[in-house]
Amino acid sequence: MTVNDYEDAKKLFEEVYDNTFVMYHEDSDSFAAEGLAVAMSYKIGGKTAKFKTIQGVKSSNVTLTQVYELHKNSLFTYVEKLGVLQTSEGKMLSGEYIDVVLGEYWIRFRMEERMQRLALTQDKIPYTNRGIGMLVGVAELVLSEAVAMGIVEEGQYRVDYKVREDVDSNEVALRKYNYILWTAMLQGAIHTGQISGILTYDIVNREEA
């Protein structure tokens, strides 16, 4: 959401919410956060919320101190840098990056959707290694799609599971299987960094004779 009064923004400094991000902009007609939400609805989880230009929104009249305070408390604003209008950060009030939260939801909901579709399109998912393999295959498919979305790094995910022989017979009788565990490395994004260099009068690359 967009907060238009800095004092109101300060009241949110102690709040911690995983699913809420707050932008400060003194212009009540800016709707900066709402515009960012629309931009982040495309290629979910695969792009950072920082550095984004929001059409029709002017730079916020904030001081460097205010920007520092906002960022310290996981809020952000809309500024101009190098002549380009852009969001100054991209975090939820919890401190987690917006793209990470969206990526987690994308994987979770897509996994549920694909598992449900599997159950609906098959006569049954047999409680055998073949049936377990069907579930594992769905999990691997969703994670491969998460790679294509830019959420997960290529080659950096795995799906662990128990084979039928290792499952207690009582659970088989209950038709319950809770042994698929996937692990994936977030692709992440670079937001800040330092480039170092040296100017010298010495020859750097000598030509071979």
PLM ranges: what are they?
Residues 1-121, 142-145, 159-165:
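A glycine- and small-residue-enriched flexible loop/hinge signal that marks low-structured segments
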Residues 90-209:
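Structured, hydrophobic secondary-structure cores that serve as assembly/anchoring elements
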